[in-house]
A protein has these predicted regions:
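A conserved mid-to-late transmembrane alpha helix and its immediate loop/hinge
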Residues: 168, 278-319, 342
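A membrane-periplasm/extracellular boundary helix in multi-pass inner-membrane enzymes
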Residues: 104, 110, 173, 193-236, ...
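Hydrophobic transmembrane alpha-helices and their immediate junctions
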Residues: 30, 159, 188, 192, ...
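Alpha-helical transmembrane segments of multi-pass inner-membrane proteins
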Residues: 21, 50, 73, 89-118, ...
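Membrane-embedded alpha-helical segments of multi-pass membrane proteins
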Residues: 9-28, 65-75, 133-141, 181-188, ...
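Long extracytoplasmic/lumenal interhelical loops at the membrane interface
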Residues: 233-237, 241-244, 259-300
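Transmembrane alpha-helices of multi-pass inner-membrane enzymes
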Residues: 18-25, 329-388
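Transmembrane signal-anchor hairpin modules in multi-pass inner-membrane enzymes, especially those
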Residues: 1-54, 59-60, 73, 80-96, ...
Length: 388
């Protein structure tokens, strides 16, 4: 398992390999396939996006739809694998420690670009994009909060504290305003849903958030010569034109959409077409409308968004069960989902293979726990009257 986690953490390209492995398991019938909302939803999204690609005569969108098929098979594998809490905790620990290596790589990357007289460079580490890198590290910080609650020794406490400092530094170096704001929202959700709240923890969390905010302000001011508010304004202003053009695309094809890579292929006809300078600067690398829900509407129309909302609705029903049962994992699951929603206002993290895999795995864990799919330890009762 560790080799597949390494492939996911260290490159968006090698992250595909574990997904292909899950396809192999499915074809050989080595995994059980349940008829649940995750499997129905992801497979339906795959079929509909493939159909949209065909109707739009887009080879790229047709091929990209198989990415959803890979998410579907990864989700099936996760449902079969994450049936024990020991496995879940083990994977979360491995992902965290490997992310430390990615964070160190990001710090080295920043130092290298400073030496090359490019201090404005935003790190992307092993995730290919600063915003996706920020989202990954923000999720890892939330995972560390959970792992701190499962610690068994004081040495683990010290280790996690050091790790969270390093990951936080790496997050700040991405300068991803969306990921940072999403993290603050995620931390808020984590602690209002946490069972074991005390004054010391609340003070510690407020201190961490305060220090991170101050550091973020300092970095934005010194490196990019702007403030977080200014960065938010710039970020929204650059996206408004994208959203306007994407909305036009949606109204042109509201049912079928333009295919998963429709924005990349046809967006130039709608987005910033009135401003050549912005058009050439932004549209050349734009693969989605920089909004989670608008991405579904443009790529797969109202049907695609409806399928996604079907998955989310049932996911929240399962999360409600976990909340009522006071499950230990619930704060983490709620916080990571909150992050997707918050950052989804200005980005679509599900287009990144590493974050997409994390999303479906967290979803599979939620489903398994809420629907009693976990393997429980059986207590063996010795009966002296029974001959062995």
């Amino acid at each position: 398992m560790i080799y597949y986690i390494i492939m996911v953490v260290f490159s968006p390209y090698t992250a595909i390999i574990p997904a292909v492995y899950s396809v192999n398991l499915l074809l050989k019938r080595k995994v059980k396939v349940e008829r649940n909302y995750w499997n129905i939803g992801l497979f339906s999204l795959f079929l509909y996006s493939m159909f949209s690609g065909l109707i739009n005569k887009s080879l790229l969108s047709f091929l990209a739809s198989f990415g959803l098929f890979l998410y579907f098979t990864v989700c099936i594998f996760a449902q079969n694998y994450f049936t024990k809490m020991s496995r879940i905790n083990m994977v979360l620990k491995i992902v965290t420690y490997l992310s430390v290596i990615a964070a160190i790589g990001g710090v080295i990357e920043k130092i290298t670009f400073i030496l090359l007289n490019r201090p404005e460079h935003r790190i992307f580490s092993s995730f290919g994009n600063p915003n996706m890198t920020g989202a990954w590290f923000a999720n890892i910080i939330l995972i560390i909060f959970y792992l701190q609650g499962t610690k068994k020794s004081s040495s683990e406490t010290l280790t996690y504290n050091l790790v969270i400092i390093l990951i936080s530094v790496a997050l700040l170096l991405t300068e991803s305003t969306g990921a940072f704001i999403a993290l603050i929202g995620g931390i808020f959700i984590y602690y209002i849903t946490s069972r074991n709240k005390n004054k010391k923890e609340i003070i510690a969390v407020c201190t961490i958030v305060g220090l991170l905010s101050l550091l973020f302000v300092f970095i934005q001011n010194k490196i990019t010569k702007t403030t977080p508010i200014g960065e938010i304004v710039i970020s929204f202003n650059s996206r408004i034109g994208i959203w306007e053009g994407s909305t036009k695309m949606f109204f042109k094809k509201p049912i079928l959409g333009w295919g998963l890579l429709g924005t990349f292929e046809r967006g130039s006809n709608f987005i910033f077409s009135y401003d050549p300078s912005l058009h050439n600067k932004i549209i050349s690398f734009l693969i989605h409308p920089h909004n989670l829900w608008l991405t579904f509407l443009v790529s797969t129309g109202v049907i695609g968004l409806g399928i996604y909302l079907y998955i989310k609705f049932n996911l929240y029903k399962d999360m409600t069960k976990l909340y009522k049962e006071k499950n230990q994992l619930f704060p983490l699951l709620a916080a990571t989902n909150a992050m997707i929603i918050i950052q989804g206002i200005v980005d679509c993290t599900l287009y990144a293979p590493q974050l997409g895999i994390m999303f479906v795995c967290m979803g599979a864990i939620t489903y398994n726990i809420a629907n009693d799919k976990m393997v429980r330890k059986r207590k063996l009762i010795k009966n002296k009257d029974i001959a062995v």
